[in-house]
A protein has these predicted regions:
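Positively charged n-region of N-terminal signal peptides that target proteins for export
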Residues: 1-4
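Juxtacatalytic substrate-recognition/specificity segment
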Residues: 25-141
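Soluble non-cytosolic domains of exported or imported proteins
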Residues: 46-58, 115-120, 124, 139-143, ...
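Acidic/His/Gly-enriched intrinsically disordered linker/tail segments
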Residues: 119, 140-209, 215, 221-222, ...
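Surface-exposed patches in mature extracellular/periplasmic domains of secreted proteins
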Residues: 66-79, 135-142, 160-168, 225-231, ...
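Beta/coil-rich, acidic/histidine-enriched accessory regions frequently appended to metallopeptidases
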Residues: 6, 20, 240-317
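Bacterial N-terminal signal peptides
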Residues: 7-15
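Bacterial Sec-dependent signal peptides at the C-terminal "C-region" and cleavage site
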Residues: 14-23
Length: 317
């Protein structure tokens, strides 16, 4: 609660410098390693501006935990207020997307009628901010960009204290199960080719399974010295923000080059062109994520319980 109040008070200071322009309300907020430009496409009172800025700061800062600083030094966030049931949802943030056209811009469509606490409990903004941890990935390998963002949306929500450990693993398990049951006839690359409308769950959660497998393998073999966080931090130092789109193999080869022992292309060769879904169940079992009637129970005496705790630990790397 103290952290929440501090963020809101800091946000109010930034909000006082907000300016009304033809594009809406424009302000800035500092996050680790970056200055975030914020455009709110509506005329709203300063208190609400302050609340929204605080939420955006907290969300972007949670992504900064991956490497210690935000992956883009000057991101632009555009907030678009919409109706209560836009996109057929009453969610506080029913839709978001990232565009890259001369700048990296995160667009978030929000329901202003919801209290600010509901925004903190919603994963959409965390998912969209997490996209900036990677270069833009070409559509034929979209499962990587959407999957890594889907993995991190749950991990980072737990690290920020917006999910409990059990909630984060419950949501991860449910997503992975949706992916496993979606289009078992397709490989991950084929699912990306089929498109979001025909293979959405496989695209989003097949890549999340790869992220989980890589993260656990890196942590286990290095006794916690390496992780998906650390290798993405190295990618950020050398290559982000990136001007051009990357293929999936190019990304995975680059990530492997940042490790003493490669892992990503091995996972790519194993799963990208093979029908079915990455085998994540044995990893969950070793982590102590026990599934009982579709409900997650966490075992602290499991072989890799400390790795599980490190993945979703508060502000942990």
């Amino acid at each position: 609660m103290q952290k929440f109040l501090l963020i809101c008070m800091t946000a109010l200071l930034f909000a006082t410098a907000a300016a009304a322009t033809r594009d809406g309300i424009v302000t800035e907020a500092e996050i680790p390693g970056a200055t975030m430009r914020i455009t709110i496409r509506d005329s709203i009172d300063n208190n609400k501006v302050g609340e929204l800025v605080g939420w955006l700061q907290a969300t972007a800062s949670s992504v900064s935990v991956v490497s210690g600083r935000f992956p883009n030094p000057s991101p632009h966030v555009v907030v678009v207020p919409v109706g209560r049931t836009s996109w057929g949802s009453s969610s506080p943030v029913p839709f978001g997307r990232v565009t890259r056209n001369g700048e990296e811009r995160i667009e978030l469509y929000i329901n202003l009628d919801r209290p600010i606490e509901d925004y903190y409990g919603n994963w959409t903004a965390t998912h969209e901010f997490s996209h900036l941890l990677l270069p833009h990935i070409r559509d034929r390998h979209k499962w990587i960009s959407e999957g890594f963002a889907s993995y991190y949306q749950n991990v980072l929500m737990a690290r920020a204290g917006n999910y409990s450990h059990a909630e984060a693993w419950q949501y991860l398990y449910e997503g992975l199960e949706r992916g496993r049951q979606s289009r078992p006839d397709l490989s991950l690359n084929e699912a990306a080719g089929a498109g979001i409308r025909r293979a959405r769950m496989k695209i989003y959660w097949g890549g999340a399974a790869i992220a989980l497998l890589a993260d656990v393998a890196l942590r286990e073999r290095s006794n916690g010295a390496e992780s998906l966080d650390t290798v993405l931090g190295r990618l950020q130092q050398c290559c982000l923000p990136a001007d051009a789109s990357w293929s999936g193999p190019r990304l995975f080869r680059k990530l492997d080059s940042l490790l003493e022992e490669p892992i990503f292309m091995r996972l790519y060769r194993q799963y990208a062109t093979t029908p079915g879904f990455p085998g994540y169940q044995p990893v969950l079992q070793k982590l102590g994520v026990v599934i009982d009637r579709k409900k997650v129970r966490l075992r602290d005496d499991a072989e890799l319980a400390t790795i599980r705790e490190a993945i979703t630990g508060s502000l942990s790397r």
